[in-house]
Amino acid sequence: TEKLDYLQDLGIDILWLSPVYKSPFIDQGYDISDYYAIDPLFGTMEDMEELIAEGKKRGISIIMDLVVNHCSSHHEWFQKALADPDGPYADYFYFIESDKEPNNWESYFGGSVWEPVPGTNKYYLHSFHKDQPDLNWQNPVLREEIYKMINWWLDKGIAGFRIDAIINIKKDLEWCSLPSDRDNGLVPVPESLVNAQPIEPFLQELKERTFAKYNAFTVGEVLNETDEELHFFIGKDGVFSSIFDFKQTMLGQEGKGWFDHSLPTADELKESIFQAHERADSIGVQSTIIENHDEPRGVSHYIAEGQVNDTSKKALGTIQILRKGIPFIYQGQEIGMENQVFESVEDFDDIATINGYHVAKEAGLSEEEALAAIAKYSRDNARTPMQWSAEPGLGFSDGSAWLISPKPDVAINVEDQEKDPDSILNYYRQLTALYRHPLYGNTIRFGDMIPAYRERENIIAFERRGDKRLLVISNFQNRQATLELPASIKTVILNNVAGLFQEGDQVLELAPYQTVVLELVE
């Protein structure tokens, strides 16, 4: 709550909280043991109510993470199911009688999705960790419990939810094994979703029983959606207000593990942005990210190695914030936090990262190579404490943090950037201020986005057209570029370097990673 003024100064309208519910924290709180309680690690319910109230005073709405594909194995529902395998709570989950694992599906965190129930001939399903049993959405009693919980939070005053892993609630109830090309014979669980029953009835009912009653804002975590599903998710009568555009985060992920991934190029980033926009623009609103709690730091991922600096960080931020959509800024993004330095696998906390390390080792990589591979992509890169200052504890806490890099770059912190008018933080404030600008706000919030210089290598540029004609150009490379403008410049709205070199009215010479926001003469 004490940081709400900071968020207000940053131009934030909505604050999304990762899970703060009671949890044993096997998976950073995405294993919820009580949906109605705040974990003592974060405070009390009174603290939560104060945050909601103080946020409203500042025009900041609070949304929570809604994790209803699974709960924690510590949740009373699952404990009651284990205590009475034939009782009503067993039907809250997926228990299968079998003398072996029912199929060859592989969980998101590695290994089989099936865990044996000790002392029985049954297995239960977990698409994620074994301590995150999947909830059985086929059961109307379970669905009623979920709707009751959601409405309880909406009654408390939150504005909506970010909806976690929701595509996974649909299942192939035939539990069919699938062809595998892997040495372990397993198939990643997302591939099973192709044969799953329709998800539409579940989500339509979810919306009608909860979100629609409160005009709640919802943003779905949905990957690999089809064009038809896009209409269902965010069309005129879509079940969600928005979904995240993950197309750019999935670039280079065609391999069999993190060790086999490749970092995206500037042109791949550009095309993913434009293709996602062209696919969704006539349908609904996407939410944009360059990083989140499930991704490495964006500046370390999208900017070429050796070229990460304040100028290139501002360039990347400009592209994300000013492209069409709802921009989400992840904590620390606004000060340019980078991937952390991890010296051994023991430094990591994230279960997906540790699994990625073992997958790399099994593929024949050395310890050093496996560590280098997971360090690039680890979710822990974005899960270290927010760097408020350079002092011990980074201004986050006087105590021991749950996760901290052995060598944090303490030079990147809020306190120092507050004092520097040219800092990344103050540049982000200028970016978000454009959404409220009396001349340009409507164009940026609601205007069309039209790709520009699409064929030019390493140039990421687009027009925003509405009340005004704006042009965003980023020379996303480590060398100069010359561009001929489509019209004369009326106003230089924003520039991430000092000065703008022009030859005549319509020719620009851009420095490496120089990024400008221009109003053009119409």
Each language-model region and where it sits:
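Short glycine/proline-rich turn/loop motifs
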Residues: 123-138, 185-187, 294-301, 405-416
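Active-site regions of oxyanion-processing enzymes, predominantly non-cytosolic
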Residues: 153-165, 286
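Acidic/aromatic-lined carbohydrate-recognition and catalytic surfaces
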Residues: 1-151, 155, 168-226, 235, ...
